[in-house]
Amino acid sequence: MITGLLKKVFGSRNERLIKQYRRTVEQINALEPKFEKLSDDELRGMTETFRQRHAGGESLEALLPEAFAVCREASKRIMKMRHFDVQMIGGMVLNDNKIAEMRTGEGKTLTATLAVYLNALTGKGVHVVTVNDYLAQRDAEWMGRLYNFLGLSVGVNLSQMPHDQKQIAYNADITYGTNNEFGFDYLRDNMVYDPSQRVQRPLHYAIVDEVDSILIDEARTPLIISGQAENQTDLYQRMNGIPKLLERQIGEEKADGTGVEKPGDYYVDEKGHQVYLTEAGHEKAEQILSQLGLISEGESLYAPQNITLMHHLYAALRAHSLFHRDQHYVVQNDEVIIVDEFTGRLMTGRRWSDGLHQAVEAKEGVTVQQENQTLATITFQNYFRMYEKLAGMTGTADTEAYEFQEIYGLEVVVIPTNRQAQRKDLQDQIYKTSKERYDAVVRDIRDCYDRGQPVLVGTTSIETSEYLSDLLNKEKLPHQVLNAKQHAREAEIVAQAGRPKMVTIATNMAGRGTDIVLGGNVEKQAGFIEADANLSDAEKAERIAKLKDEWQSLHDQVKAAGGLHIVGTERHESRRIDNQLRGRAGRQGDPGSSRFYLSLDDQLLRIFAGDRVRAIMERLKMPEGEPIEAGIVTRSIESAQRKVEGRNFDIRKQLLQYDDVANDQRKEIYKLRNDVLESQDVGDMVANLRESVLVEVFREYVPAESMEEQWDIAGLEQRLRDDWGLELPLAKTIEGAQSIEDEELLDMILKAAREHYDAKVAQVGRESFAGFERSVMLQSIDTHWREHLAALDHLRQGIHLRGYAQKDPKQEYKRESFELFARLLDVIKSEVTRVVFNVHIQSPEELEQASEQIEEGLAHLENVQYKHDEFAEGAEPVEQAEPARSNTAAAALAAMGGEAALAGMPKVGRNDPCPCGSGKKFKQCHGKLS
């Protein structure tokens, strides 16, 4: 109440910001006549003038009015479009590291050009981030004309693009690309073995289009580059039959033992998107697994050796109970392809993690692909927070304003529309059953069709869109279907969705990127005429004029019929997605309307609000086919949506808190890796590592401040001989001296080690040896970082159970992951030192060859999978790499001397510790190569 009163007196913060920006818009408008008088060359020359002024110390804020005025004038000449005042405000919001919420059709793409042009003057590069390759390429070509006219270079960064073209794209002043590709390029740049192989420059400024989709919807899904792990495809197929033998329990058992409507073997928690075996289910599963010969008679599923089976069983249960064909995925060309739940697009190449994708493949009877091991991973939150400046734009961000501020420090500013919105949002209609709901939808579509009004029908799954299409076919109503399966025709279908009597059924319209213009889109047809070489300029002009006249007539006809009508067949769990669908109607002051048709069978209502609404319907004794249409019901649905949004926010926040721990470690490892990569000579680094490791070894046998009687000199001599090949007469030295300090012994060892190392370097030359050392260090860092990521993943999966011991899982995760990281650094240090110290090469030629062999062994980016990992549901965005060798020492020794290097090793049992000192079993280390 008090907040509302203050807003009335002082205006909201949003209104105050808009007022400030309007003052700057007045300055820009005052400059317009001045720049209109300039020739094209003079206007283009302003870019270089601005660059020099900025280099001379003038801030971008000081340049802003003139730069925006120049950009607007160039757009008028090249694009035949003049930025509206509200677009100028949008450009300033983007430059101020904020999110501009602009309604659909208000020209976000053109608005972005203002902030992009201004920030490109720094020469540090601007990234414009879109949701798919089609939009990246379209916007780069479309707006590239404007930037090129102003003397700026434009690049487009697409997936599967050759390496040299990527470097050119990133070196341009402005780079368009998708969020996934920018993130994967960052990870790939931190896996290269030569600085010249990197593609990205330091991250300076990014504008994220559809910012809510990228920074919120996809923030639950880390990007992952992975390589193949152990092959267990047969196990997935054997496990696939088990869910069919188990019965589903209806209702969840409460603390008092009530709540179960029908007992069963497993319970599906739709709200938490999880499956749980009941006690009876455990016993039944154990019997089935015993019959299959997967566990011994009477053995528990929880025995340590059966944990993997437990993991596979739950993956199979989730695949059968929670993931449905044509809703969560489609099957094409012997592959299971994920459908993006927010946009309805196919996510080719992405795979769910934790064995879920393999379980779905087994369920659908397609080829089961191997599981993957993570090589590198990052979340969008942590990737985008690395930019010096970050801004975004979307049609719907205000509902998530708190999250943008909390996670990214980005303020949302709602930009006023250029013309007053005229869309009518009608109240939801709720029916008892799905059949009644779809009958009402078909009646509404028929009514609009008869009046010549175009209709856009939004569905939440491919299955629903195809079911509705069948109903319309029976009614002989012509229509177009736009879902993940019709991806290729997307732009064409959307462009014509505003023509009279046009009925378009679409799965979630988020990120479609094409406006629905009343009367249809003439730009595309005009483009075909322009491209026709057989027509003269006069004929082209005549045909385009005729086309525009026809369009005007259709446009007026549709406006008279009420504009575009939006029909929602189900509420999405996010209000924002519903608002995006509604936002397709009523663009730029056009008329339009929207209505959602719901049924009590809908997932959102069933889980969160079904009982309450059903009780209202029964109390009112609603006859069949009669809907409820009341504000109280609509409010209760919005309350349910808020609950889901809150839960999803908590999931994303929790993911970020855990990933922040890994992120700090990632930064350190990548910094270390880049230091190695960029140093001219890593000899000093190796010398420091060698000294540090030898001091630790020495102190194991000669503790600090200890008496001579406590020293284990025989053990130290043996260790130096076995691990380092150093024959040092330490015992004789001590005997021959009247008294000796431990520091003298240490100096003696360090000196001998230094001489041993210098002799090796002298043998082959400093330059050749430095290349070898760099390869060994990079290989060691990469191998153990991969293993560390797997360990962190394993730690995270079970860390929540610490809560039962009254411990804070997050604090426990921080503590244990830090211990793992300290151990990782120790292992890298000792392994690099040992490999470099023990290498045996006779000639420079052999050393060169060995170094090349190692680098070939490291070319693990040829067969890589790129994943965008679904955190909440187990899905992961993946890239597929060659199975990497698990031990650097083995790889390096094999490279140095091949079989001969291994032949010199003592005879060891497969389960004994490996003599290389890695701490692993022999079969998991050098035994793999022998």
Swiss-Prot record:
Annotated EC: 7.4.2.8
Presence of keyword Chloroplast: no
Protein topology in the membrane: Peripheral membrane protein
Swiss-Prot/TrEMBL GO biological process terms: intracellular protein transmembrane transport; protein import; protein targeting; protein transport by the Sec complex
Catalysed reactions listed for this entry: ATP + H2O + cellular proteinSide 1 = ADP + phosphate + cellular proteinSide 2
Residues holding ATP: Q87, G105, E106, G107, K108, T109, D515
Residues that, per the record, bind Zn(2+): C914, C916, C925, H926
Keywords: ATP-binding, Cell inner membrane, Cell membrane, Cytoplasm, Membrane, Metal-binding, Nucleotide-binding, Protein transport, Translocase, Translocation, Transport, Zinc
Essential cofactor(s): Zn(2+)
Cofactor binding, per record: May bind 1 zinc ion per subunit.
Gene Ontology molecular function: ATP binding; metal ion binding; protein-exporting ATPase activity
Enzyme class name: translocase
Primary location group: membrane
GO cellular component: cell envelope Sec protein transport complex; cytosol; plasma membrane
Location(s) in or outside the cell: Cell inner membrane; Cytoplasm
Function summary: Part of the Sec protein translocase complex. Interacts with the SecYEG preprotein conducting channel. Has a central role in coupling the hydrolysis of ATP to the transfer of proteins into and across the cell membrane, serving both as a receptor for the preprotein-SecB complex and as an ATP-driven molecular motor driving the stepwise translocation of polypeptide chains across the membrane.
Family stated for the protein in its record: Belongs to the SecA family.
SUBUNIT field: Monomer and homodimer. Part of the essential Sec protein translocation apparatus which comprises SecA, SecYEG and auxiliary proteins SecDF-YajC and YidC.
Record-given protein name: Protein translocase subunit SecA
Naturally occurring in which organism (per UniProt): Cupriavidus metallidurans (strain ATCC 43123 / DSM 2839 / NBRC 102507 / CH34) (Ralstonia metallidurans)
Gene name tied to this protein: secA
